[in-house]
């Protein structure tokens, strides 16, 4: 990759250079570690002092933060890349410097791979060692499937998608264009569906065949060891632009709306529908058969047990952490709340009775 100049990066990202546009940018680094020739960014005014002290060759800033730097008398003689959204600008510049994405130009099928004769694998694809592609599977252009991947019968993988090592896409499932599936992802395993048959000797759980699919839209990224189960009859659907972190469980028949982000270890129970542009914190969990409105934010560790109908809300159910002894004392109080409520209700009744008895006679 040719080393870009600050001016080139500005042109590519709709930003403005304050300083030397011919400065060669050789890499990216945090504010407190960057050196000459490296680009960093400031997206939070709390780190303004780090930006002032940084040895970075240039810093991506907003116009407002650059004015704060000027107010400190520290802007002159330095290089700034002024962007409407410094964090987004940094992300796009980082894509340019992503060596893993930009240097892997391999194509072809590794001789150790197994590809069904009727599978569609364009010449622009790369199929790594020990990959198995079953009958009728269809890959788009420039798909890369790294070592030990599995694509089931009749499954589809869209153009420019990347499946890291040990990713499994089960039969009939669909992965859209430009997907990134990290190692250990499983798309389309059976949903957790069993019918309880109660007999004289106990309960037998009868497996319900999961005949739906798991369908991922375009530009979806799924983190390591996440499972997205196939539907029982209808499909499980992850819409365009969703970003799902590591170790997330998406159960059968769930639908996640476009451009929703879900952080690590969250779990969504069956048939729940999450709206568009939602933000789900780590270890949040959802009961089944719920409807969650668009643009809902759920804090990490929160349990959602009822539908949310109003868009744009922020919900939290986590008790803040405390020193252990204080937490135990509070827990003891919580255990006694039912008895305390009963006492308060009884006292209120007595007071109302006393008030009624003390009123003057109307005779």
Swiss-Prot record:
Its EC number is 2.3.1.191. GO terms for cellular component: membrane. Gene3D superfamilies: Hexapeptide repeat proteins, MurE/MurF, N-terminal domain. One of its GO terms (biological process) is lipid A biosynthetic process. It catalyses: a UDP-3-O-[(3R)-3-hydroxyacyl]-alpha-D-glucosamine + a (3R)-hydroxyacyl-[ACP] = a UDP-2-N,3-O-bis[(3R)-3-hydroxyacyl]-alpha-D-glucosamine + holo-[ACP] + H(+). The keyword Transferase applies. Disulfide bonds: none annotated. Pathway: Bacterial outer membrane biogenesis; LPS lipid A biosynthesis. Pfam families: Hexapep (PF00132), LpxD (PF04613). The keyword Protein biosynthesis does not apply. Keywords: Acyltransferase, Lipid A biosynthesis, Lipid biosynthesis, Lipid metabolism, Repeat, Transferase. It is an enzyme of class 2 (transferase). One of its GO terms (molecular function) is N-acyltransferase activity. InterPro entries: Hexapep (IPR001451), LpxD (IPR007691), Trimer_LpxA-like_sf (IPR011004), UDP_GlcNAc_AcTrfase_non-rep (IPR020573). The active site is at residue 252. Catalyzes the N-acylation of UDP-3-O-acylglucosamine using 3-hydroxyacyl-ACP as the acyl donor. Is involved in the biosynthesis of lipid A, a phosphorylated glycolipid that anchors the lipopolysaccharide to the outer membrane of the cell. Homotrimer. HAMAP family: LpxD (MF_00523). Belongs to the transferase hexapeptide repeat family. LpxD subfamily. This is UDP-3-O-acylglucosamine N-acyltransferase. It comes from Cupriavidus necator (strain ATCC 17699 / DSM 428 / KCTC 22496 / NCIMB 10442 / H16 / Stanier 337). The lineage of its organism: Bacteria, Pseudomonadati, Pseudomonadota, Betaproteobacteria, Burkholderiales. The gene is lpxD.
């Amino acid at each position: 990759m040719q080393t870009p100049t600050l001016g080139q990066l500005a042109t590519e990202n709709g930003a403005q250079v304050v300083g030397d546009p011919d400065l060669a940018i050789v890499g990216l680094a945090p504010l407190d570690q960057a050196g000459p020739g490296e680009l960093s960014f400031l997206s939070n005014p709390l780190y303004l002092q780090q930006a002032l002290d940084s040895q970075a060759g240039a810093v991506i800033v907003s116009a407002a933060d650059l004015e704060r730097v000027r107010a400190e008398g520290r802007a002159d003689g330095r290089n700034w890349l002024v962007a409407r959204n410094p964090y987004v600008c940094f992300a796009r510049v980082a894509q340019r410097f992503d060596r893993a994405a930009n240097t892997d130009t391999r194509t072809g099928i590794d001789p150790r791979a197994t590809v069904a004769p009727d599978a569609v694998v364009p010449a622009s694809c790369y199929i790594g060692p020990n990959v198995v592609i079953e009958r009728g599977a269809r890959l788009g252009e420039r798909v890369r499937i790294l070592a030990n991947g599995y694509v089931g019968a009749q499954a589809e993988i869209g153009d420019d998608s990347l499946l890291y090592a040990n990713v499994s896409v089960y039969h009939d499932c669909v992965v859209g264009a430009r997907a990134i599936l990290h190692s250990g992802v499983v798309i389309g395993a059976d949903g957790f569906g069993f019918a309880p048959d109660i007999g004289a000797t106990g309960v037998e759980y009868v497996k319900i065949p999961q005949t739906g699919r798991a369908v991922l839209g375009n530009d979806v990224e799924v983190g390591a060891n996440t499972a997205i189960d196939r539907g029982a009859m209808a499909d499980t659907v992850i819409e365009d632009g969703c970003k799902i972190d590591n170790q997330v469980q998406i159960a059968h028949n769930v639908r996640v709306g476009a451009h929703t982000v879900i952080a690590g270890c969250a779990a969504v129970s069956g048939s729940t529908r999450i709206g568009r542009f939602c933000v789900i914190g780590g270890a949040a969990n959802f009961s089944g058969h719920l409807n969650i409105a668009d643009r809902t934010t759920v804090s990490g560790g929160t349990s959602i047990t009822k539908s949310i109908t109003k868009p744009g809300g922020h919900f939290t159910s986590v008790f803040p952490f405390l020193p252990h002894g204080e937490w135990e004392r509070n827990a003891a109080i919580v255990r006694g709340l039912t008895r305390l409520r009963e006492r308060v209700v009884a006292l209120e009744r007595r007071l109302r009775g006393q008030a009624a008895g003390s009123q003057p006679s109307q005779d």
